[in-house]
Amino acid sequence: MGREYDGLSLPAAVPGIHHVTSITGDVQRNVDFYVGALGLRFVKKSINQDVPDTYHIYFGDYLGTPGTAMTFFGWPSWPKRRAGSGQVTTVGFTIPEGSFEFWVKRLRDLHIESSRATRFDGDVITIHDPDGIELDLVTGSSALKLTPWPDGPVPNEHAIHGFHSVTLTVAEAQASVDFLTKTMGFRQKAQDGRRTRFETGGGGPDSILDLVESPEGPAGEESIGTVHHVAWRAPDDKHQADWREKLIAAGRNVTPVIDRWYFKSIYYREPGGVLFEIATDSPGFTIDEKPGALGSGLSLPPWFQVRRDTLGETLTPIVIPTNLVQGRASSR
């Protein structure tokens, strides 16, 4: 599942992105966009375990493989988008080489505004999701071992191939640079003005972090249309425990290990204020649903099962798009 590990590089460096979690104000609209427009599979309908009367939903490849999982907290009562420093401000997805014009046309046909650019010698399409989160579609060749969604609205040869990168915006970059390179094992690869590119693990898509210094910008706040955190991969509990020790030794305030049922997590902030997580690859989303049924029902960890009836009445129903024809999807 995901990249193969040589067993020698951890905890010297995290191998890549595990998942990215953001905040949406309209879960149904969010599902319509990420499934119907971007062609990601809806792989899990669960709850935010810290605010259990709200959704935590997950998108990805057919299995939600680590390195593909874009997830959202459904918090409609939260304030609207307040993006700024101390946040992940852009999420990058990988699209296959040769798919650039396909995506330009697809987005135009779906009436989604986009812009085109070249960054570090790569072609980039920039769009925004319905809540305003900035997304990059970047051409590249990913080493992630994915399971394609055969029934998705995007042909497999053009489908999103997991994450490409995350962009962090910070008020002052040097402390973040030192932490990324000296503690987390990132390597600096390129620089363009205030943007510095780093990579980790085997390099390439799903391992890239761009750091943008913005001393004059406003501080970001947790709000609808912002990224809550980015999670980095650990192949197992042992590697995660090693990382926790290393981070504490580096002066980070790290949470205890938290069992999220689909993975185990530790959380901490890098010096620029961005919330990081290290999440285990296992057990994955098929722990409580078969692959073909992923996302079809409300999935709850065992310790929340006693609240299933109450939560089922509290949570607004989600309709998964099924009319996936000619690049369009409808849940209506």
Predicted regions and their residues:
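Vicinal oxygen chelate
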Residues: 1-11, 15-25, 46, 76-171, 192-210, ...
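Peripheral, non-catalytic segments flanking oxidoreductase cores
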Residues: 2-7, 69, 73-82, 140-141, ...
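Short beta-strand/turn micro-motifs at beta-sheet edges
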Residues: 6-9, 78-81, 152-155, 214-221
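Core segments of cupin and vicinal oxygen chelate
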Residues: 23-66, 109, 115-117, 121-128, ...
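Conserved donor-binding loop and adjoining core beta-sheet/short helix segment
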Residues: 44-49, 59-93
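A structural feature that tracks compact, well-ordered secondary-structure segments
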Residues: 60, 73, 137-138, 168-169, ...
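A compositional/structural signature marking long, glycine- and acidic/polar-rich segments
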Residues: 198-258
